[in-house]
């Protein structure tokens, strides 16, 4: 679970995602957005996993209940950030939509998560109104974090810990990555 904050503009940020993340992060971002809806607009209840363990779930009062993904990793910093206010949610939604477009551009296919586009387009009804957008909280090892700079932290994370994934189909290598 993460939000790869590689550029403040969601379109450019999506283009900077490496090939592996273009595929994988579409699912994770849909999970983050779905979790925001469930936790903010849903009613909490206790359910049981397939193994019989108790688990918290949130039931939505409308069609979203049968459309959106289940809530997951609810205390992860990326999840907390995504549901903190409508501006953070909106930025993540725009990144996700641009990543869906990027997936189609790179692979000439439509990602299965595109079916959630309409359901996630509107922020949760009860989400806090944000006065300003904040940068996603870095979720990575401390040795690559740059104090008070999420963008530099995520670029560091990519250049130091994600080199094995450094492929960009139909895209040039990002200039900040190529400079290392």
Name each model-derived stretch:
Residues 1-75, 79-180:
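Sequence termini and other peripheral, non-core segments
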């Amino acid at each position: 679970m993460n939000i790869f904050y590689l550029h403040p503009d969601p379109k450019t940020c999506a283009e900077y995602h490496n090939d592996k993340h273009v595929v994988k992060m579409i699912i994770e971002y849909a999970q983050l957005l779905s979790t925001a809806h469930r936790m903010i607009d849903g009613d909490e209840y206790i359910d049981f996993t397939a193994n019989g363990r108790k688990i918290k779930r949130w039931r939505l009062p409308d069609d979203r209940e049968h459309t959106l993904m289940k809530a997951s990793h609810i205390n992860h910093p990326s999840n907390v950030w995504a549901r903190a206010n409508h501006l953070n949610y909106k930025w993540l939604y725009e990144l996700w939509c641009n990543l869906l477009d990027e997936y189609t551009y790179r692979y000439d296919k439509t990602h299965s998560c595109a079916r959630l586009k309409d359901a996630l387009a509107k922020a949760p009804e009860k989400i806090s109104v944000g006065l300003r957008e904040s940068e996603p909280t870095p979720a990575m090892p401390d040795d690559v974090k740059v104090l008070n700079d999420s963008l530099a932290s995520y670029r560091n994370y990519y250049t130091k810990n994600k080199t094995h994934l450094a492929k960009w189909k139909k895209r040039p290598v990002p200039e900040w990555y190529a400079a290392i």
